[in-house]
Amino acid sequence: VGKLQVTGWGNTRRITIIINDMKKTKIVATISDKRCEVEFLEKLYRAGMNVVRLNTAHQDMEQALKVVENVRKVSDNIAILIDTKGPEVRTMLMDEPMHVDRGETIYLTGDPELKMEGKLIHVSYPYFAEDIKVGDKVLVDDGDVELVVVEKKDHYLEMMVTNEAVIKNRKSVNVPGASLKLKSLSDKDRAFIDFAIDNNLDFIAHSFVRNKEDVMAIQAILDARGSKIKVIAKIENQEGVDNIDEILDYAYGVMVARGDLGIEIEAEKIPKIQRYIVKKCIESKKPVIIATQMLHTMIEHPRPTRAEISDIANAVYMGTDAIMLSGETAYGAYPEEAVTVMREVAEENEGTVPPDAGRSLVRINNEITAALARSAVKTALMLPIKAIVVDTLSGRTARYLSAFRSDLPVYARCYNERVMRELALSFGVYPYYTEKPMSRDEFMNDLPEMLMQNGIKADDYVVVVGGSFGHGKGASFIEVCKIGEIR
């Protein structure tokens, strides 16, 4: 990720990233308050981490704040993403674990007052018996226990156990294919959204997004407080997959959360769903993250399996913007090595993706910025171009260039540190920050120094995408320049 150089002139502060890590695929790393020392975070940053993820299922606000403060001591360039828990159902009111045998009959209810003979399990959703049908499968504890609905009663379900297991308190309950009337946001979620706003975080990844309304529920809170935090929709069930188009209309980006997705949907369908969602995100010019168990072996072992290496490479081949580590960096024994493996696999395999991969998917939708972005990428293919450079106020032009998946680096000059961090989730974009918005001449005259710091020579050519250099104008021109001749 290179060294951070801070320079300035007059009252203007400029941050220039000198990039040693030239992977285009971004890396998200989950960080726990149990291990978030500044030195540790610096190692992950140097290894290739672009975004820090906080998992609110395992942290309170004091613990999360500790991570945030330490990340900010490392670099303003690292984005911070916080997960909500989202709508979920869990077992509850169990004083002790319950052993169940294959073929045994047990009972499930959402009524906390219900008592009866036999093995009864309470769950945290009051309409459970109402929403579930005879024949539905109910999966407990991340799928370790499978139950089948045999008969429906007014306030409980009669279930048959299909495998011997032990059911414990506060374990997850999933019903593949069922549409439950769960609230999108819990009280804890709302509190953490306020925490994210108060601490100027960059992304909120909302769990179990089923439709546009789930995204809008968070956006309404953000809008009411004037927050610019971007919403990432975590797709974790069939309903989310089915409604991906409307979700993409309202979310900033998408995370393919394969853990719960693989419980809610048959595991053998996950690869094609992953490919489908990545394709949809590229079409919509929205960032996409592939997550869960990418280097699971490295939680305990220093080297990954060949299958894990292939999993990362396949995500790169599909054209994902980012890949994510969970337990590997949160509590695993080899966190720095895991980030390094991800970076090395991404770097090695990005160059083997066909030059036009995904490029034809992107929808222009009569947008001038999108048309210019496509023209810039096509121009770079036809000429001996070394880089694409963009001046961006909102980050939109840089994101659109990213969507066309150029095999050249896209250097994005940003005038807002939040925009710079938002681009930490965009494939192939290397954002850098300048406090003072520039005129066109200032922008062009400043390019040679930055580009040559990043290995581009005076006789190299670049494509410049720019606009009217004013708020709300957007990109309006592309220009091919020889670095040594810019005046």
Protein language model features and the residues they cover:
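Non-catalytic helical/linker scaffolds that mediate oligomerization, partner binding
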Residues: 19-487
